[in-house]
Design a protein with these regions (language model features):
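Hydrophobic "anchor" residues on beta-strands that sit immediately upstream
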Residues: 75, 117, 156
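ATP-dependent small-molecule kinase phosphotransfer cores
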Residues: 4-8, 12-94, 98-99
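Glycine-rich phosphate-binding P-loop
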Residues: 1
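NTP-dependent small-molecule kinase module
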Residues: 125-178
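Hydrophobic residues at beta-strand termini and immediately following loops
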Residues: 11, 120, 159
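PAPS-dependent sulfotransferase catalytic domain
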Residues: 98-111, 140-152
Length: 178
């Protein structure tokens, strides 16, 4: 059901580049949740409690899944690793990219140190076209801004994700295997 906030959306027209009921529902759901999260996470006690439980959950899930590889001294390649937890929660909390970066630094001791960070830069518009479960462009724009800030501030290796898959794959392999 489309929320009242989006009641004027016509179901058979494109919404943010996608067509139909599904995208209208995703937008409505995002708007509803964003409003609720904004109210809940304004309270610093709620933010702290939420982040504590999210970190504990992520910490145990991560270590259960990777401990055997770490103990065996194997190389591990992660997709977003623990950083995405901080990016998502930072968006929920309304934090600036700088504040998110500081939160990552504060809790990095909980996770293994990475040898390299490879940032595959893809515009929000391209991401939106590639996936059909993205809530809306606002969400992608926020994530993009944060990852751009993190990549520049931490001197990550950046690969242009707008290129054909084979070229992106080749560049990542070169970075990781060299």
């Amino acid at each position: 059901k489309v929320s009242d906030k989006n009641k004027n959306i016509k179901m058979n027209v494109q919404v943010d580049g996608k067509c139909g009921v599904k995208q209208a529902e995703l937008n409505a759901d995002y708007n509803t949740k964003a409003g609720l999260k904004g109210k809940i996470f304004r309270n610093p006690i709620m933010r702290g409690t939420w982040m504590f439980f999210a970190l504990v959950d992520y910490f145990f899930q991560f270590h259960i899944k990777t401990l055997s590889f770490i103990l065996a001294g194997k190389n591990i390649i992660f997709d977003r690793f623990y950083l995405d937890l901080f990016v998502d929660q930072g968006i929920n909390f309304g934090f600036s990219p700088d504040r998110i970066s500081k939160e990552i630094q504060k809790y990095r001791f909980l996770f293994p140190r990475m040898d390299n960070y490879v940032y595959i830069r893809v515009s929000p518009e391209t991401c939106y076209k590639r996936k059909n479960d993205i809530p809306n462009m606002d969400y992608l724009n926020k994530r993009y801004e944060i990852y751009e800030f993190l990549a520049k501030g931490n001197k990550w290796i950046t690969v242009d994700g707008e290129q054909p898959f084979e070229k992106v794959n080749s560049q990542i392999k070169k970075v990781v295997l060299d």
